[in-house]
A protein has these predicted regions:
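Catalytic machinery of carbohydrate-active enzymes
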Residues: 1-406
C-alpha cells in the first residue's frame, strides 16, 4: 500500500475511530477496579512493541527492548511490525513465534493479519508500547490486542496528533532526543504509575553503547567474499565502498541526486584499489543497475535485491565505507564497525542519525530543514529538495578521503 494511502487512512479513518474507541475505553476503565500499574512481582504476561512504518527503526529500538526484558525477565516480549521487518527482528534475537507480521501492501491482507493477532493475545495480561509517535493505527492496535497498559507519546496541548483517550501512560514527545532515547523512555514507563503526568521524569542517556551489535563469523564473511569473486572474477576486492542511493517511498525527498552519485562514483574509481558495490532492495534493482552501468560497469557491482538481511550485514562487515542517504541502511550498518557517511536533508539527524561511533553526517542545515517530522506524518510540501541538492560531490569526497586516509 502506498505511503500516501496509509496516511489518508490514518487521518480520515483513524481520527473518528480513535475518538470512539477512546470513549469506550474510558467508560470501561471507569467501571473497572483493576490496576494498570505493574511491579516485578506482578508483571505482564506479554510485552508487545509496535512499529509498522520504517524497518530501520526496529534496530534503533533494540536498547528499549533489552530494557523491557531487564525490567520483566519473566514476561514474553513480542513485536508487531510490517512483513518486511521479519528478518531484522530474527537477527535481533526474536523467535519466529514472537514476531507478528501485518501485511501493509493491501487492506484485505492487513485486516486478515489483525484478526490473527487478536486471537494470539486472548485472555492474556498485555502491556503494549507504541514506538511511532502519533501513528493512529499503532495506537489502536494496543486496544485491539486487549492491552491494559498502553504506552506511547501523547500530544497534550499540542495541535494535531489526535489519539483520543487510547493511551494509559503518556509521554511527551521530545524532538531533542534521539529516537533510541525516546524508545528507551517508553520502555522505562512500564513501571510508572498512572498518577504521574507527563512521563518520563528521568534523564535518558545516549544509547550508542547499548545499540544492537551483530557479530558476523569469519566463515560467513569468507563465504560472501567467495561469492563476490565467483560472480565477478574480473573485479579486485581490495577496498570495498558501498553506495546506497535510494530511500523508502515514505520520504523520497531524502534522496541525494542520482547524478551526484554518478559523479562521486567516477571520482572514487580514480583510485585503482577501490571497488564500488551498490546496495538496495529488490524493487530498486533496475534503478541501481542504471547507476552501476553509468558509473563503470567493469568496476561497479549491482548487489541490490541479491542479499538476505544477514548477508547485507555481512557485506557491511567486509566493506570499508558506506555512503548512504538517510534511510534504513544508516541503522543496519550501525550494527557493525563499518564507517558510515550519511547524507541528511529533510529530516534531522538529531532524531534518526546513525548510532555508530564510526559515523559522519553531512547536512546543509537549511532554514527550511527539517521539513518532515512525526507531526506531519513525514509528509512535506517541498517540490525542490535543495537540502540534498546543495550537498556537493566535493563535500562528500572530502569526507570519504578522511575515512580512507587519502
Amino acid at each position: 500500500m502506498h505511503p500516501d494511502t496509509m496516511r489518508l487512512i490514518d487521518r480520515w479513518a483513524g481520527i473518528p475511530i480513535c475518538f470512539l474507541t477512546g470513549v469506550w475505553s474510558w467508560i470501561k476503565s471507569a467501571r473497572s477496579s483493576k490496576s494498570d500499574n505493574y511491579t516485578k512481582q506482578d508483571s505482564p504476561e506479554i510485552i508487545v512493541f509496535i512499529g509498522l512504518s520504517e524497518i530501520g527503526a526496529l534496530v534503533v529500538a533494540y536498547p528499549a527492548i533489552q530494557e523491557a526484558r531487564k525490567q520483566f525477565p519473566n514476561s514474553c516480549v513480542y513485536f508487531i511490525t510490517a512483513s518486511e521487518g521479519a528478518q531484522t527482528l530474527e537477527l535481533m534475537g526474536f523467535g519466529q513465534e514472537e514476531i507478528l507480521l501485518i501485511n501493509t501492501s493491501s487492506l484485505t491482507g492487513m485486516l486478515y493479519d489483525l484478526v490473527k493477532i487478536r486471537r494470539r493475545f486472548n485472555c492474556k495480561r498485555v502491556s503494549a508500547i507504541v514506538l511511532e509517535p502519533f501513528i493512529r493505527i499503532s495506537a489502536l492496535l494496543t486496544l485491539w490486542i486487549g492491552a491494559s497498559q498502553r504506552i506511547g507519546c501523547y500530544r497534550f496541548y499540542n495541535e494535531g496528533g489526535f489519539l483520543g483517550n487510547l493511551l494509559t501512560h503518556r509521554l511527551v514527545y521530545n524532538s531533542h532526543l534521539h529516537a533510541s532515547q525516546t524508545y528507551f523512555a517508553l520502555a522505562k514507563a512500564l513501571l510508572e504509575p498512572l498518577s504521574i503526568e507527563p512521563l518520563l521524569k528521568e534523564k535518558i542517556p545516549s544509547q550508542i553503547r547499548n545499540r544492537l551489535k551483530i557479530d558476523i563469523s569469519a566463515d560467513d564473511q569468507q563465504i560472501l567474499r567467495n561469492r563476490l569473486k565467483l560472480e565477478h572474477p574480473e573485479i579486485a576486492l581490495q577496498k570495498i565502498l558501498l553506495l546506497n542511493a535510494n530511500a523508502s517511498d515514505i520520504v523520497p525527498l531524502r534522496k541525494w541526486p542520482m547524478e551526484s552519485f554518478v559523479e562521486l562514483g567516477k571520482k572514487l574509481l580514480k583510485y585503482p584499489e577501490i571497488t564500488i558495490i551498490i546496495t538496495g532492495s529488490e524493487a530498486e534493482q533496475q534503478e541501481c543497475e542504471v547507476l552501476s552501468r553509468t558509473i563503470n560497469p567493469d568496476r561497479v557491482i549491482n548487489f541490490s535485491g541479491k542479499t538476505s538481511f544477514k548477508e547485507l550485514i555481512t557485506l557491511y562487515s567486509i566493506s570499508d565505507l558506506l555512503i548512504t542517504n538517510d534511510s534504513g541502511p544508516v541503522h543496519f550498518a550501525s550494527t557493525t564497525d563499518i564507517p558510515i557517511l550519511a547524507l541528511f536533508g529533510p529530516e534531522t539527524p538529531k532524531i534518526f542519525g546513525p548510532m555508530s561511533p564510526n559515523a559522519k553526517v553531512i547536512s546543509t542545515e537549511l532554514a527550511c530543514s527539517p521539513c518532515i517530522s512525526v507531526f506531519n506524518q513525514k509528509k512535506s510540501s517541498c517540490n525542490d529538495n535543495q537540502c540534498m541538492k546543495q550537498i556537493s560531490v566535493k563535500m562528500v569526497l572530502n569526507e570519504v578521503k578522511k575515512f580512507l586516509g587519502k
